[in-house]
């Protein structure tokens, strides 16, 4: 685990104008998947990936949840590591003391799995246990879902086929949910204990995505051995 030493207090510099401070609650990170990652992950899924049914470890009411094959994931770990470190680094840079120079964070992907969702499928509100970070990436959307969304937009609360993140309670200047209408290439990273849910859609076809659980450890620069591995 990466040890973050939170600041005991903040010192404000001289601001030229108004500067908003955001000390409370988690952020949701967004990036765009490389085209080659989308292509390789789709090919991996279509050939059966690892062949390991991952659904007993999950809560989704969906068509299929299957573990990624390591060979498909391996060429793309640099992208996911960079995003994870950027995400944690952004938070640490604002709220934590600087890391000692001899400590270098190292990203570990604990598990990664594909989710194949058909019309009527859904994922109940849930969190990811025994991890620090989780993520969702989108690989395929059902053809014609834009028409369903256009019709849903006429309703008072469009949510069909959306993913919703949930944290905290409602307040005057705080909304406890974030609804996202996903598209192919979207990649979201967030703390593993952030609740989220996926709503069903009606369009015939498949929405394909993947999720991962991620840990970050402290790797010492001098010998590359994680601190927790030392005797």
Predicted regions mapped to residue ranges:
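Preference for bulky hydrophobic residues occupying beta-strand positions
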Residues: 31, 137, 212-214
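Catalytic core of non-heme Fe(II) oxygenases with the double-stranded beta-helix
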Residues: 111-189, 206, 220
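Ligand-binding loop in jelly-roll beta-barrel domains
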Residues: 199-209
């Amino acid at each position: 685990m990466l040890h973050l030493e939170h600041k005991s207090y903040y010192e404000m510099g001289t601001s030229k104008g108004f500067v908003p401070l955001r000390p409370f609650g988690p952020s949701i990170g967004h990036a765009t998947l490389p085209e080659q990652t989308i292509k390789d992950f789709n090919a991996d899924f279509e050939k059966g990936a690892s062949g390991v049914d991952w659904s007993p470890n999950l809560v989704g009411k969906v068509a299929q949840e299957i573990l990624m094959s390591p060979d498909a994931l391996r060429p793309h770990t640099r992208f996911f590591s960079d995003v994870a470190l950027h995400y944690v680094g952004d938070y640490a840079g604002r709220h934590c003391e600087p890391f000692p120079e001899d400590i270098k964070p190292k990203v570990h992907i604990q598990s990664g799995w594909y989710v194949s969702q058909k019309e009527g499928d859904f994922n109940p509100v849930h969190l990811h246990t025994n991890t620090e970070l989780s993520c969702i990436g989108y690989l395929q959307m059902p053809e014609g879902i834009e028409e369903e969304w256009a019709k849903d937009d006429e309703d008072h609360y469009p949510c069909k086929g959306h993913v919703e993140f949930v944290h905290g309670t409602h307040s005057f200047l705080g909304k406890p949910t974030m609804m996202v209408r996903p598209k192919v290439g979207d990649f979201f990273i967030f703390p593993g204990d952030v609740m989220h849910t996926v709503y069903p859609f009606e369009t015939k076809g498949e929405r394909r995505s993947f999720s991962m659980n991620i840990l970050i450890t402290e790797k010492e620069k001098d010998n590359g051995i994680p601190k927790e591995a030392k005797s």
